[in-house]
């Protein structure tokens, strides 16, 4: 099963983004899951006695979330019964965490276990993680 963003099939994502917030929907019972996924991560390798860091693409193309109940349903019912949608592409990790929590609170995922697989919300972010000078200059509500 593929990822969709704004109704379009996604096969590649611009490398300027670090990850995305997603919504997975079970078509059989309507339950949903909101989560986030990084597109790449850092690995280290010992080269000539020094640690070298490099980036490795994550498993985002085949990813179905970290929730065990959701993954169990995907195995039992098959990937064809689930839709994977990208809600928000994010440039920074802090922005990614912020928007994941924002969507989870917006949808009240903890109040409706019959509608959502999400069992907990974990976020720790600071204003500096999401606000940059460029972003502040774009805001029109600041005088």
Question: Residues of each region from the PLM?
Answer:
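Structure-specific nucleic-acid interaction/processing domains
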Residues: 1-143
């Amino acid at each position: 099963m593929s990822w969709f963003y704004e109704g379009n099939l996604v096969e590649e994502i611009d490398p300027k983004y670090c990850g995305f917030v997603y919504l997975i929907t079970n078509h059989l019972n309507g339950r949903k899951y909101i989560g986030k996924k990084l597109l790449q991560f850092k690995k280290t390798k010992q080269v000539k006695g020094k640690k070298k860091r490099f980036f490795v693409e994550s498993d985002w193309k085949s990813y179905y979330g970290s929730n065990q109940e959701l993954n169990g349903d995907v195995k039992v019912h098959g990937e064809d019964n689930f839709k994977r949608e990208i809600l928000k592409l994010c440039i920074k990790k802090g922005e990614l965490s912020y928007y994941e929590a924002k969507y989870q609170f917006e949808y009240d995922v903890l109040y409706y276990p019959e509608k959502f697989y999400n069992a907990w919300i974990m976020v720790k972010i600071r204003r500096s993680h999401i606000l940059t000078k460029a972003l502040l200059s774009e805001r029109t509500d600041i005088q």
